[in-house]
UniProtKB/Swiss-Prot annotation:
Induction: Expressed during exponential growth and sporulation. A member of the spoIISA-spoIISB operon, it also has its own promoter. It comes from the Bacteria. Signal peptide: none annotated. This is Stage II sporulation protein SB.
Amino acid sequence: MERAFQNRCEPRAAKPFKILKKRSTTSVASYQVSPHTARIFKENERLIDEYKRKKA
């Protein structure tokens, strides 16, 4: 038998489109923010979590 049939591997050309995975979260830690802004971000995160718990 041919080698391609033994391995049962698809050649790379058979998949012309690359599947991109969507990032689930974005990172805020990549840049520095003022302490005031950091507090606002933290408070927003807390409120979003509280809202999600009430909706669930």
